[in-house]
Amino acid sequence: MEELIGVEIEEKGEVVVATLTGELDISVAETTGRRIADAVPSSARGVVVDMSALEFMDSSGVSMLFSLARQVGSHRQELRVVAPPGRPVARVLEIVEFGRAAPVHEDLDSAVGEMATPQA
């Protein structure tokens, strides 16, 4: 069976970037969230989930993001999400007001840049 979702994880300094491609639905949401959370070392400032190339996300994907925000927050780390305007995923995040749980950025550079900059 073909994998619905692609997950690429890399470290950019003190920030972990998880790039998702394909479809994030109930069949892969739980394992995807666990894989991302497990990839964030305690020394990291947090994680950026890049959803720029994600084609589809259902409510289980939204739930996974809220859970991930709580989980990294409990370790005093940050979650940021990349969802460019005009993409279906960006609209879903807007509807559920995900920005109240974690910042949503238009591009990866701004998400990583803001997280890498110490807050006063």
Could you describe each region identified by the protein language model?
Residues 1, 17, 21, 51, ...:
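Generic N-terminal initiation segments characterized by hydrophobic and/or small/turn-forming residues
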Residues 3-34:
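STAS-typified acidic loop motif
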Residues 10, 82, 105:
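General small-molecule cofactor/ligand-binding pocket signal
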Residues 12-13, 52, 109:
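Conserved catalytic submotifs in the C-terminal HATPase_c
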Residues 14, 98-101, 107:
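Glycine-centered tight turns that cap/initiate beta-strands
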Residues 23, 85, 108-110:
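Short, solvent-exposed coil/turn elements at secondary-structure transition points
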Residues 26-102:
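Amphipathic alpha-helical interaction surfaces in cytosolic regulatory modules
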Residues 104-120:
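A charged, well-structured terminal subsegment
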